């Protein structure tokens, strides 16, 4: 399968076993749900009426005072009382098969290529870590919402993109299904695509 470099107009042969898969939408959805669920901290905790501090004694007698009846200082309707349905720490982790995860990544990458949202560059570098320089470079190739994938951590690109909410720079090892579908277009370097071919072969 052939893909053209955007900076040199040369042709590069990419692996069909990775970049020419049928788009499996139900699988991609399932993997994204699992991925987001695994990122949840699940540490929220509240105290119920049985856990908050306070006396168990009835504040006043049931009848004769003219006041509303009450049985406990720890009642949820009282100030400093417990929470009615107190949240407890919970594990949201869902099972995710490695084979399914890898296929979902391949499926997304293949669909990005089919939709002409995948741009290959021999190299994509900027001289100084300046947002202005990066913006100008992206404007020249008409890219606004873009995910830039490099083979290694690129400090200049990383610093230049930090203040741009529509631009994200990651290295190959940080690829995941959520980030791949979060941007309109994907820009990838030759060294990064070679690493992907090794990782997902």
Swiss-Prot record:
GO molecular function (one): structural constituent of ribosome
Pfam families: Ribosomal_L4
UniProt keywords, alphabetically: Ribonucleoprotein, Ribosomal protein, RNA-binding, rRNA-binding
Matching InterPro entries: Ribosomal_uL4, Ribosomal_uL4-like, Ribosomal_uL4_dom_sf
Sequence segments annotated as region (Disordered): 45-75
GO biological process, one term: translation
Cellular component terms (Gene Ontology): ribonucleoprotein complex; ribosome
NCBIfam families reported in the protein's UniProt record: rplD_bact
Function: One of the primary rRNA binding proteins, this protein initially binds near the 5'-end of the 23S rRNA. It is important during the early stages of 50S assembly. It makes multiple contacts with different domains of the 23S rRNA in the assembled 50S subunit and ribosome. Forms part of the polypeptide exit tunnel.
Protein family (similarity comment): Belongs to the universal ribosomal protein uL4 family.
Quaternary structure (record): Part of the 50S ribosomal subunit.
Name assigned to this protein: Large ribosomal subunit protein uL4
Organism lineage: Bacteria, Pseudomonadati, Pseudomonadota, Gammaproteobacteria, Enterobacterales
